[in-house]
Amino acid sequence: MAAKDIRFGEDARSRMVRGVNVLANAVKATLGPKGRNVVLEKSFGAPTITKDGVSVAKEIELADKFENMGAQMVKEVASRTNDDAGDGTTTATVLAQALIREGAKAVAAGMNPMDLKRGIDKAVVAAVNELKSISKPTADDKAIAQVGTISANSDESIGQIIADAMKEVGKEGVITVEEGSGLDNELDVVKGMQFDRGYLSPYFINNQQSQTADLDDPFILLHDKKISNVRDLLPVLEGVAKAGKPLLIVAEEVEGEALATLVVNTIRGIVKVVAVKAPGFGDRRKAMLEDMAVLTGGTVISEEVGLSLEKATIKDLGRAKKVQVSKENTTIIDGVGDKAAVDSRVAQIKTQIQDTSSDYDREKLQERVAKLAGGVAVIKVGASTEIEMKEKKDRVDDALHATRAAVEEGVVPGGGVALVRAVSALAGLKGANEDQNHGIQIALRAMEAPLREIVANAGEEPSVIVNKVKEGTGSFGYNAATGEFGDMLQFGILDPTKVTRSALQNAASIAGLMITTEAMVAEAPKKDEPAMGGAGGMGGMGGMGGMDF
């Protein structure tokens, strides 16, 4: 086992604080409407230019192992806030730096670290309650657009396109962000349930202009096995033909005689049919077929539930207002399923989302919710260069997460004002002893740090602005973009409550751990290995010159 380098007390904390300051100073330069960019070197290709706090934090590794531990712990604040709320990483870093710096000074002055931590925790709990009390729900598209604009560094076009996307697919709908091919941002909306499987034969096409198979008011057969024998399908086909409606078949596979018969019937106009493969694989395929059954009011024909294809009737089929099948995608629009059953299915999937620890599974489950609840919107980000594209895509991602958080828990006045108002409301808060009181004061001072940093990045004097904001009430604050004082809600400067709350809670959590750290252990640097000696002593072999070769 390698030797360890161990540091104690003030020596350990001071090194840790140095690491915190290096990382936080790099990250906080990006805060606010006049925050600066940070350029990140990449191992290959052009460097990345970003104003995204968590992207900056993730790139930082320090040479000194003890300083690096401090930096990595603050990086955890940014990452956790990003995971919880999708935004607010820079605010969380600024709060953590202020708490750690002041906390370390108090410990060095002889105060009890545990009491300081208890004081900080007490202040944070009270501040979170105050934030919740001043929070306002996001009632309209305008508020959603404003939140998106602020999070995208005051880019109104990004805020507006996110508001448009939410309006189209609903607040439960999935909105994805992709790199576009043009210079402008574009919004592409798919309503209904779409999955990535197309027609199994081009002979099913009935709309030559769009090269799609369009079915109006069709029946929908859902089967979890292969269909190769046409005899199994006859009862269903006869029932559909009598009803005079088209039919969509979604099965694991439709092949051989069955596919050929369906094509012939379609060409002759006897029954209008389109066959597609079921999406997904294994258990995910079964779940998606079940989703389609709920959406269309049908039943999955499966031996697992005692149903066989040859005994299926028209009552087992789903219905929808319209189905469109292209070469690569199938879209089911306006399924006739019971709304209560759909809502119940959505609630069930949401429970699975909360329980899963896999990001991939969570993403797939969220897609299923969207397909049941409303639809999918794709924001295609436009830019003139690849570097600009990456930077802009990061901002759109941030803005999207912020708007989702705003819809979830409401909004508070932005620009650091909400935290300053929380400080005013907690003026009379007291702890069990003087050290706890000092911890409370550390937390209250730290809550002013985001506003101070926003003002400093705008080139103004922080103390003057902060004092003027503290003199005001409600949503009165400072608009750093224009240099004006006024009502932040009227300026359209809003922060999601969830983002501000997560930033404060995560910063306090890590700060409490660092203040109460008394020892640090790291691997000792390896000393250079000495060169191998002794090989030079073979000179005596020169006496072998008399040997014949």
UniProtKB/Swiss-Prot annotation:
Highest taxon of the lineage: Bacteria
Catalyses which reaction?
A: ATP + H2O + a folded polypeptide = ADP + phosphate + an unfolded polypeptide
What name does the UniProt record give this protein? Answer: Chaperonin GroEL
Homology family: Belongs to the chaperonin (HSP60) family.
On subunit structure and binding partners, the annotation says:
Forms a cylinder of 14 subunits composed of two heptameric rings stacked back-to-back. Interacts with the co-chaperonin GroES.
Q: Which gene encodes it?
A: groEL
GO biological process per UniProt: protein refolding
Q: Where does ATP bind?
A: 30-33, 51, 87-91, 415, 479-481, 495
NCBIfam families under this entry? GroEL, PRK00013.1, PRK12849.1, PRK12850.1, PRK12851.1
Q: Function, please?
A: Together with its co-chaperonin GroES, plays an essential role in assisting protein folding. The GroEL-GroES system forms a nano-cage that allows encapsulation of the non-native substrate proteins and provides a physical environment optimized to promote and accelerate protein folding.
What main location does UniProt list? cytoplasm
Q: What class of enzyme is it?
A: isomerase
Please name the Pfam families in this protein's record: Cpn60_TCP1 (PF00118)
Please verify whether the record's keywords include Membrane: no
Q: Which GO terms describe its cellular component?
A: cytoplasm
Q: Does the keyword Iron-sulfur apply?
A: no
- Which keywords annotate this record? ATP-binding, Chaperone, Cytoplasm, Isomerase, Nucleotide-binding
According to the UniProt entry, the coiled-coil residues are: none
**Which HAMAP family does this chain map to?**
CH60 (MF_00600)
Q: Which organism is it from?
A: Stenotrophomonas maltophilia (strain R551-3)
Any one GO molecular function term: isomerase activity
The listed locations are: Cytoplasm
Report the EC code(s) recorded for this entry.
Answer: 5.6.1.7
